[in-house]
């Protein structure tokens, strides 16, 4: 991806610079019915936003993020990625999560979920979510964030888990537990480099999610 040819200074409307960008989002969600009580659901979610002309970055509200009960459930919402970036500050030799949200220009998320009836209104689920976000251009403040065809597969987070659902017909109450089996920030090259220097990395723990409705 090349640099943007942005007018200097940027053009303005009513004294404020405006944004130019192109955004594409694709979300494919097939559902396979094995029998009356067993289903296999899948999702492939892809998105890209490209700034141009009057913009060098996409508007914050138009950028992509991952994590949370409807995405990669093994990670808190907006706290993972982009790419192999290590989203932690090192304080007193301990890696402490950064406060700012993590967003970017490219998103790839894939999920597979086996849904089954347990008894009456109680349902169960086994699932695995994989994916990440990336920037189009280099980010000097977030090394490892840029998308690269040769490395992006190794930067896909992996989060298997299990869930319980209470199906009340009009509402489905969902309880999901997911484990960050592979965290590209901690398990990737940047995190492991800090570990070799003696930095204490965060302990990976299961993440609990509560939501209403299916994740996809």
Regions found by a protein language model. Give the residues of each.
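C-terminal outer-membrane beta-barrel translocator/porin domains of Gram-negative envelope proteins
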Residues: 1-116, 126-149
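Short acidic-hydrophobic sequence patches enriched in Asp/Glu that either
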Residues: 20, 156, 204
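Outer-membrane beta-barrel strand-turn architecture
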Residues: 32-36, 116-120, 167-170, 216
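Transmembrane beta-strands of outer-membrane beta-barrel proteins
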Residues: 40-44, 124-128, 162, 173-175, ...
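Surface-exposed intrinsically disordered loops and tails
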Residues: 96-97, 187-203
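Flexible, small/polar- and glycine-enriched "cap/hinge" segments at structural transition points
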Residues: 129-131, 136, 161, 165, ...
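Strand-loop-strand
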Residues: 140-168, 195
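Outer-membrane beta-barrel "beta-signal"
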Residues: 166-170, 202-216
């Amino acid at each position: 991806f090349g640099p943007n040819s942005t007018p200097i200074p940027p053009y303005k409307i009513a004294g404020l610079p405006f944004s130019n960008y192109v955004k594409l989002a694709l979300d494919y969600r097939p559902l396979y019915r094995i029998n009356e009580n067993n289903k296999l659901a899948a999702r492939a979610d892809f998105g890209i936003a490209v700034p141009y002309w009057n913009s060098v970055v996409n508007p914050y509200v138009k950028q992509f993020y991952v994590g949370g009960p409807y995405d990669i459930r093994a990670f808190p919402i907006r706290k993972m990625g982009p790419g192999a970036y290590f989203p932690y500050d090192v304080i007193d030799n301990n890696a402490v999560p950064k406060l700012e949200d993590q967003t970017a220009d490219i998103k790839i998320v894939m999920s597979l979920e086996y849904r089954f009836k347990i008894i009456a209104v109680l349902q169960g689920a086994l699932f695995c979510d994989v994916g990440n976000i990336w920037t189009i251009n280099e980010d000097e403040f977030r090394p490892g964030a840029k998308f690269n065809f040769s490395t992006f597969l190794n930067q896909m987070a992996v989060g298997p888990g299990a869930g319980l659902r209470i199906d009340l017909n009009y509402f489905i109450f969902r309880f999901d537990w997911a484990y960050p089996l592979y965290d590209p920030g901690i398990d990737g090259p940047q995190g492991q480099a800090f570990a070799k220097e003696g930095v204490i990395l965060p302990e990976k723990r299961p993440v609990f999610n509560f939501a209403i409705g299916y994740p996809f």
